[in-house]
């Protein structure tokens, strides 16, 4: 109330003044400076006093007036202080008993095993199923492994002729070599073109290439056979069985100067890149070797794209690096990286 009157902004001089202000104005007038009851000074007990009080408390918690007066005379304190000390000592004793009882109730609860823990056997019961190999890569390995006899007559043996697909890269991209001999007029496009024509035939592409039962070597002057041992040592980070990357493989492994020398399916020039292309299929065991002096690529396998599996393989060819075929259905093809 006093602070409210002091803070009142509208109080006139002499009207809104409180008690403390009036004392300053009229120091001779005796106003009560502290209206509250005077608090008793806190009693501090010495060690000897506490020992005497504790000894009496050990005898009885509720001493009578005579005991309290006797102890008050010993410790030189009024009897009321002794009475208050006993009252506080009893309250302290009750508080300690309550804490001990609550602690005894909490301790057995902590010792109980937590139900959230599971036995270690339950975690091992779940079996981890490895991801299934894509149907395209498995069919690639099976088709290439089905006819190893057809591959034996040629120097280029596919690295994945065994049952398991070996990491390799399909690196045919923009190859436009010397046209094929007259005896094989339909094989004038390179291996990538024939593979892509077969892929396009399944998706409504341009033309389908008939299967040739015997392997052939195109352009004997460039044909070089590489053994199987170093086939897996070149570019072993990607698998041809799951996707085709004719454009992308060229962009990564050849300088951009070669892009100007690309040719389409209509005009196949005499220029060729130093590719080493091995193509093995279950129905088309063709092998072509374009072996130059620069960069040998690992022989890789490509599937028979007349199968229905080819409909799930989608390629996306950039217009800057288009070669070998007229891709009429570019929107439907998508390049998929595993």
UniProtKB/Swiss-Prot annotation:
InterPro entries: HD, Homeobox_CS, Homeodomain-like_sf, Otx_TF, Otx_TF_C. GO terms for molecular function: DNA-binding transcription factor activity, RNA polymerase II-specific; RNA polymerase II cis-regulatory region sequence-specific DNA binding. PROSITE patterns: HOMEOBOX_1, HOMEOBOX_2. Residues 38-97 bind DNA. Pfam families: Homeodomain (PF00046), TF_Otx (PF03529). Residues 174-188 have a biased composition (Pro residues). It comes from the Eukaryota. One of its GO terms (biological process) is regulation of transcription by RNA polymerase II. Residues 91-206, 261-290 are annotated as: Disordered. CDD domains: homeodomain (cd00086). SMART domains: HOX. GO terms for cellular component: nucleus. Residues 94-103 have a biased composition (Polar residues). Keywords: Developmental protein, DNA-binding, Homeobox, Nucleus. It is found in: Nucleus. Residues 116-126, 134-173 have a biased composition (Low complexity). Embryonic expression is highly dynamic. Detected along the marginal zone of symmetric embryos at 5 hours of development and found at the shield, a primary morphological asymmetry at 6 hours of development. With the extension of the body axis, expression extends to neuroectodermal regions fated to become fore- and mid-brain; found in two stripes at the posterior side of the eye rudiments at 12 hours of development, distributed in the diencephalon, midbrain and the epiphysis at 18 hours of development, and found in the diencephalon and the midbrain at 24 hours of development. Plays a role in very early embryogenesis, gastrulation, and the development and subdivision of the diencephalon and the midbrain. Establishes and positions the zona limitans intrathalamica (ZLI) in the diencephalon. May play a role in the organizer function. Probably acts redundantly with otx2 in early brain development. This is Homeobox protein OTX1 A. The lineage of its organism: Eukaryota, Metazoa, Chordata, Craniata, Vertebrata. The gene is otx1a.
């Amino acid at each position: 109330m006093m602070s409210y009157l002091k803070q009142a902004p509208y109080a006139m001089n002499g009207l809104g003044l409180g008690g403390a202000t009036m004392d300053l104005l009229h120091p001779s007038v005796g106003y009560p400076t502290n209206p509250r009851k005077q608090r008793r000074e806190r009693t501090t007990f010495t060690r000897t006093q506490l020992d005497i009080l504790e000894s009496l408390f050990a005898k009885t918690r509720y001493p009578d007036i005579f005991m309290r007066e006797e102890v008050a005379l010993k410790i030189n304190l009024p009897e009321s202080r002794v009475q208050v000390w006993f009252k506080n000592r009893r309250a302290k004793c009750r508080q300690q008993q309550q804490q001990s009882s609550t602690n005894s109730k909490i301790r057995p609860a902590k010792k109980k095993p937590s139900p959230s823990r599971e036995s270690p056997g339950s975690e091992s019961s779940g079996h981890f199923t490895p991801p299934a190999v894509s149907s395209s890569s498995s069919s690639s390995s099976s088709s290439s492994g089905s006819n190893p006899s057809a591959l034996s007559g040629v120097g280029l043996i596919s690295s994945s002729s065994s049952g398991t697909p070996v990491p390799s890269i399909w690196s045919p991209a923009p190859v436009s070599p010397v046209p094929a001999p007259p005896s094989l007029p339909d094989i004038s496009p390179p291996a990538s073109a024939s593979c892509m024509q077969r892929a396009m035939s399944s998706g409504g592409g341009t033309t389908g290439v008939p299967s040739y039962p015997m392997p052939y070597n195109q352009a004997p002057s460039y044909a070089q056979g590489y053994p199987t041992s170093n086939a897996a040592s070149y570019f072993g980070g990607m698998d041809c069985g799951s996707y085709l990357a004719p454009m992308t493989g060229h962009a990564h492994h050849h300088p951009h100067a070669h892009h100007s020398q690309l040719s389409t399916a209509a005009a196949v020039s005499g220029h060729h890149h130093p590719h080493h292309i091995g193509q093995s299929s279950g129905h088309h065991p063709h092998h072509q070797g374009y072996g130059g002096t620069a960069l040998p690529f690992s022989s890789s396998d490509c599937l028979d794209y007349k199968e229905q599996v080819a409909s799930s393989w989608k390629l996306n060819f950039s217009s800057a690096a288009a070669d070998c075929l007229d891709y009429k259905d570019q929107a439907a093809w998508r390049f998929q990286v595993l």
